[in-house]
Amino acid sequence: MYESITVPTLVVDGAKVRLNASRMLDRAARNKVVLRPHLKTHQARQVGRIFRELGLGSGTVSSITMAEYFAADGWDDLTVAFPVNLRELDSINALAGRIRIGLLVDNADSVRTLAAGLKHPVDLWVKIDVGSHRCGLSPEEPDRVAALLAEAAGSPLLHTAGLLTHDSRTYAVRGREAVSALYHEGATAMLALRAEMGKKGYSGLRVSIGDTPSASLVEDWLGVDEARPGNFAYYDLQQVGTGACQPESVAVAVACPVVGIYPERSEAVVYGGAVHLSKQSQPAMAEYLPGGPPDSCFGTVFRMEGEHWNGFLPGAWVRGVTQEHGMVHMQADDLSHLKVGDLLFICPVHSCLAAHALREDTHFI
């Protein structure tokens, strides 16, 4: 199955993707929430088609370019969950003339430029910052939010959809209780802001949230309207660390050719470095890596069962990366069975970054 792999390659287990997506759909259905999955994790038409086979008709992307890619494969309802880039107004108009598109704003300049330059209607989402401090208006500043809604109301082509947030704080904690506490805090703030906007005359606003740890761990989604998780399709080492999934649910591995073996330092070196795995690291997880890294790692080695991975190989992790090299610590017995030219299957810390880096070298099984 892997004879054709000659360079670092993202291997995608389609059966695991389908199972992960089915589980997330079930969680959304139990909460009566529309699932609008983020497609940036995989950026792959094959995965998008799995979603659509399961009944999903709307998606989320992070750029106009990505929206064009998926629109070409039949997606006709996409939200660009990134602050609108006004330099792409021509591309926005071309896309909005073909499909339903949602745009994200948090300032009046963007709203005014869109109102003046749009040729087709778009859905407009106001970005709210519930604590990530990246983009968005604070839910504690309802007057600023109302002013933005008022600005948008003056244009017949700006259809105000609602309030949108992404609470990245959930990626920095671990376990159901900690993730749930942050989710409840953020969702409650969003729902309160919607109620306040209703008092100011802006009724019918939807609330859209989106992060995989919350969507995977929180049982009660508190009545929000829409959820936009994306990483759940693949999961990764970071999600294992938050408790969002078990290692067995990770649907991707980076297949890296072994180029050197160094028993004297308990290491192998693979062709698979920062440009393939990224430089994002993950704190050690002793329960999954007995004898594992003291501080952090750049990926873990999957235990292979035939042609499929299932859990982690004990005591095996990527201790460091340079541009093309990956230095992999391994236990002596596992190292003794390894040969130069073999493949090691690495669980990436952040599958979104690995998938983007290896989008031209992806192998589906």
Task: Specify the residue positions occupied by each region the protein language model found.
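Active-site loop ensemble at the mouth of alpha/beta enzyme cores that anchors a bound cofactor
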Residues: P213-F298
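Active-site-proximal beta-alpha core segment in soluble small-molecule metabolic enzymes
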Residues: H38-A172
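C-terminal accessory subdomain/extension
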Residues: R265-I365
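Conserved, mostly hydrophobic/aromatic
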Residues: V17, K40, F70, V126, ...
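Active-site loop/helix belt of alpha/beta enzymes
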Residues: D123, V130-Q246
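Flexible, glycine/charged-enriched surface loops at secondary-structure junctions
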Residues: V34, K199-R206, A355-R359
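N-terminal glycine-rich anion-binding loops that anchor highly charged ligand groups
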Residues: K16-Q46, S58-T60
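Generic N-terminal amphipathic, Lys/Arg-enriched alpha-helix
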Residues: M1-V12
